[in-house]
Amino acid sequence: MVSAWFVVGSPVMDSSSSPCLCLDAHTTGTIRRKKILGKARNLELGSSFTGSRIVFRLSPKRVSRIANRKSKKLLIVNEDVAGNYDDTFGDVQKQIVNYFTYKAVRTVLHQLYEMNPPQYTWFYNHIITNRPTDGKRFLRALGKESQELAERVMITRLHLYGKWIKKCDHGKIYQEISDENLALMRERLMETVIWPSDDTNSR
């Protein structure tokens, strides 16, 4: 199944074989000045994808209002994008576990620095040769060298996760992502609008 829609003159294509998000206005479409008539501006919007072209005569205030209105509608959710990714999110869960393993390693390392400098030195050198990017692999290797430290890291990461899950506001995170998406798209939209200079001779 292939679905397509347009966001501010840029096509967003979805394909099961090669999903992509195309937001480059220079490659998918053009927005440029056609004429200047007094204070009104002519903006020509063309798309190389469709071969179509539309000319609008807009004032600067009108363009600004359009930009603000369009930016509120830029986030389009299509369930077909990248397949049925939301079935499991197993990779996200793995990354969360790996991150809390990394955070636990840093916490334990800091504790050892304060309380047991010799063990801190050993653990630091172990981390240099065994990066805690894969939590399970790291703890397996650490357990072969120091079961005590491995158990300490495991207990610490579980404790840290328990603290985080109580403070995590999923609604707030969702809103932050949504607001950031809109801000970035609004910023990109304003960059694609070519504003005529005020000192250009009008005809």
From Swiss-Prot:
MF GO annotations: protein folding chaperone
Gene3D superfamilies referenced in this protein's UniProt entry, alphabetically: Chaperonin-like RbcX
Location of this chain's protein in the cell: Plastid, Chloroplast stroma
InterPro entries on file: Chaperonin_RbcX_sf, Chaperonin_RcbX
Key words, A-Z: Carbon dioxide fixation, Chaperone, Chloroplast, Photosynthesis, Plastid, Transit peptide
Domain of life: Eukaryota
Transit peptide: 1-78
Induction record: Not regulated by cold, salt or desiccation.
Keyword Repressor part of the UniProt annotation: no
GO cellular component: chloroplast stroma
Main localization (coarse): plastid
Gene Ontology biological-process annotations: carbon fixation; chaperone-mediated protein folding; photosynthesis; ribulose bisphosphate carboxylase complex assembly
Job of this protein: Chaperone involved in RuBisCO assembly process.
Quaternary data: Homodimer. Interacts with rbcL, atpB and RBCS-1B.
Family, per entry: Belongs to the RbcX family.
Protein name: Chaperonin-like RbcX protein 2, chloroplastic
